[in-house]
Amino acid sequence: MRKRAILFGLFLLPSIVTFALNNSDAQWIDKVANFYGERAGKRVAAWRNVVTESAELSELEKLSAVNNFFNQLYFVNDIDLWGKKDYWATPLEFLGSAAGDCEDFSIAKYFTLRELGIDDKKLRLVYVKAIKLNQFHMVVAYYPSPSSEPVLLDNIDPEIKQASKRRDLLPVYSFNGSRLWLMKERGRGELAGNSSRLGLWNDLRARMGSVKLNRPIKNYDG
């Protein structure tokens, strides 16, 4: 019930936009509103507001702002939302649908942090096994420096924690915009090639480039 109340507030938050929209922002908001509905457009406006207001924050503050924003959305499995076993939604599709699974939460956070200027070398999308839930899961890892332990942004546990504190997660592989790693331990892993080896990643990037939107099979927008 509490999450529903928070999310309802997110839907209404940008009813009066308090920042100057650039052309891309305005086009995204209009496109999403026309495709998914007015409330969806307001969520995109709220996202752009977070990006604008977070621009001058420290990197750790940016992590917190982005993690908190996206964790307000609903968790729904791909088969229930998209009618597919596995579908990686773009950030606009995620916000437009008001729901997504762990990959959608992580992808939206990753691209927002990249937009906020965090170097790709510091970020990874990490595919893990959630031991307690006995299912595969995805989180975002942030490395403050090349040799440091990462912290994890997650939708299951909303508190940003060091990877060593997440004994409930077993890493499998990780990737970012250019590289793919196999995870042999809770560290950085072994380089296994380019992220272009991942078909779902390539499909996602193509849809982002063309700003293509797909419609979910079920409406979670209130």
Describe these PLM feature segments:
Residues M1-L7:
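Bacterial N-terminal signal peptides that target proteins for export
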Residues F8-L12:
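Hydrophobic helical h-region of N-terminal Sec-dependent signal peptides
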Residues S15-V17:
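N-terminal signal peptide c-region/cleavage motif recognized by signal peptidases
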Residues F19-G222:
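A structural boundary/capping signal
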